[in-house]
Structure formats: C-alpha cells, structure tokens
C-alpha cells in the first residue's frame, strides 16, 4: 500500500485531498498545526485503519517513521485575513517548512508536490495567466508575505529537484471553493454567502469590475491527483477559466440565496489583483484535465453546506486566536 503524507490536512483543500487518497487506497498520514485548520474537517477519518494524524508544525523538524512514497505540501495560511495577522509564520511555513519537507522527501526518496498559487502572478499584466508569465508583484506590500513565500517555495523546490534529484511537482492553484471553506476567512465566496445568510448587505471592495475564476474543489483535487502522478516537474495552473466580475458574482449569490440584500462598496485593498484567470492549456495537454463542475452547480452544493451551519457558526467573527503564533 502506497503511503502519502499530506500537510495542511485539516484545512479546506487538504481535508478533501485526504478523502481522495483514502478513496484511492492509499495509507494517508495527515499533519497540521491547526493554526487555521479544523479537526472537524477530518474527524470522519480517525476511525479508519489507513489514516493517522500528527499535530505538528512543519517549521520544526519533521519525522515520519517508516516508508513514504508521496508528500503533498498544503500547509500554509492562505487567506488574507490570516496571513496579515501572522505574516512571519506565513513566511516561515513557505521557507523553513518547505525546506524541511523537501529534506524529508530526499531522505525517504518520496515524490513531493507543493501547493503554489495564482498569487505568484501578483496583479497580472498578462491575461489570462500562463505558467511562463513571471508576474507583477510587490515584495513589501501587504500581500507580499504570502506571495513571496510561495515564490520562494517554488524556487527551493526546483533547486532540490535540480541539485538533489528529488522528484518534485508544483501546482499553481487558482481560486477554489466548496464545502469546508471557513465562513469567516475573508474570501469572497464565504463572505458573500455568510452575509446573505445573516441578512447583511453584500460587501464589494472596489467598483466590482475586478474578475475572478472559481474552481470547484472536486475539480481541483482531480487536477492535483493527476499532476502528482505525471512526469512533469514544472509549475502547472489548475483552475477554472470561467471568468466573472465580482459585481456579477454578487448578483448570482443574491439570486442563489433568494435574498434581497443590497450591495455596498468599499475601497479596494492595496495590491488586490484586478484580473485573475488561468490559462489551463498545459493541464489539458499534459494531464488531460479540465474543470467539469459549472459555477452554478458548485455554488449550489457550497451554499447548501453553509446553510447547514449553526447560527453560532454563522455569527462567529474570528476563526482562531493567533496571539500565541505572533512571533
């Protein structure tokens, strides 16, 4: 039985990856420091014979006994509301954490896939974004701690591949959504749905003409699964190229939820990208992958998930107390 380590296992995407690899017959070792992750996302796996969990911070030395075939590195604060509060921890996860896991992969002779992001393109001047685009980023801006952590992560991963022969894969993840997203993580989908369910006005930052492309989590997981098992070592975009303005998306949410909220506008945060759309040509050609789930279908599933939350969860403003991690 193949053994796989998944870091960030208690997070939104990490937990779905645990589900997929369990389903595929792997022995899954989950690891998470639970800064932003939630054990509720994986509690259904604890009773399984082929799953184990380590509560551990990957910026510290990582040891896994026994053989290891694959590593998926998905540990990192990923929403602005998190990495603006714990910027140094975010940088350490992308640097020290990635270094530790690459070292583990080298020792175990395991293939490692790291989760990069569309944020490496910054506020892009090229549209849609291909993997060859170098990006338009601000290293010292408010989003820089996340963007640069991921850019460094890609660099050290390729260095380990080139100089140590480590089997590496890099996925650049575009906006992904679905069940288990945190309602209060500051991203547009849970923000809009949460506001609608609480009877609040929907908040748009800027004029609403900025665009995003939303990929349903099952499609994202399928792309990651295929990339891990491919022979391609360079970055690959995985996302849904179906682009929409935030203003139009807000109207879709109002229609989906059957509410009559107003839309209110606030200033656009510094360095917030105005356009974000993946060029997925490589994913199609190399992996035979493309997004299958339409936004209307995926949003219906996601809305039903959020609607099932308790009133207490819907009204909760803060996910975690980060004070012990501010170093």
Where are these regions (language model features)?
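C-terminal substrate-binding subdomain of Rossmann-fold SDR/epimerase-dehydratase oxidoreductases
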Residues: 17, 175, 194-327
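Short, surface-exposed alpha-helical segments at coil->helix boundaries
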Residues: 39-42, 154, 190, 247, ...
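A glycine/serine/threonine-rich, flexible loop-to-helix segment
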Residues: 127-128, 183-191
């Amino acid at each position: 039985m193949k053994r796989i380590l998944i870091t960030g296992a208690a997070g939104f995407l990490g937990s779905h990856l645990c589900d997929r690899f369990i389903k595929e017959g792997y022995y899954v070792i989950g690891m998470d420091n639970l800064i932003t992750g939630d054990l509720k996302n994986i509690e259904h796996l604890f009773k399984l014979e082929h799953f184990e969990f380590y509560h551990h911070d990957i910026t510290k030395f990582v040891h896994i006994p026994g053989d290891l075939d694959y590593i998926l590195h998905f540990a990192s604060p990923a929403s602005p509301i998190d990495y603006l509060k714990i910027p140094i921890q975010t940088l350490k996860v992308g640097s020290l954490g990635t270094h530790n896991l690459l070292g583990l992969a080298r020792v175990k002779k395991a293939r490692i896939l790291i989760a990069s992001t569309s944020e490496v393109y910054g506020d892009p001047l090229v549209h849609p974004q291909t993997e060859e685009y170098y990006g338009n980023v601000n290293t010292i801006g408010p989003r820089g701690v996340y963007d640069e952590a991921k850019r460094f992560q890609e660099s050290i991963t390729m260095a380990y591949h080139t100089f140590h022969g480590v089997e590496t894969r890099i996925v650049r993840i575009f906006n992904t959504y679905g069940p288990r997203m945190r309602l209060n993580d500051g991203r547009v989908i849970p923000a809009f749905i949460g506001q609608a369910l609480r009877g609040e006005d929907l908040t748009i930052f800027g004029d609403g003409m900025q665009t995003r492309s939303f990929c349903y989590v099952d499609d994202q997981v399928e792309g990651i699964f295929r990339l891990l098992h491919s022979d391609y070592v360079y970055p690959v975009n995985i996302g849904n190229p179906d682009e929409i303005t935030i203003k139009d998306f807000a109207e879709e949410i109002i229609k989906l939820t059957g509410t009559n909220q107003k839309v209110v506008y606030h200033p656009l945060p510094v360095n917030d990208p105005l356009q974000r759309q993946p060029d997925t040509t490589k994913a199609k050609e190399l992996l035979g992958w493309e997004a299958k789930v339409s936004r209307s279908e995926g949003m219906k599933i996601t809305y039903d998930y959020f609607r099932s939350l308790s009133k207490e969860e819907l009204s909760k403003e803060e996910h975690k107390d980060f004070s012990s991690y501010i170093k």
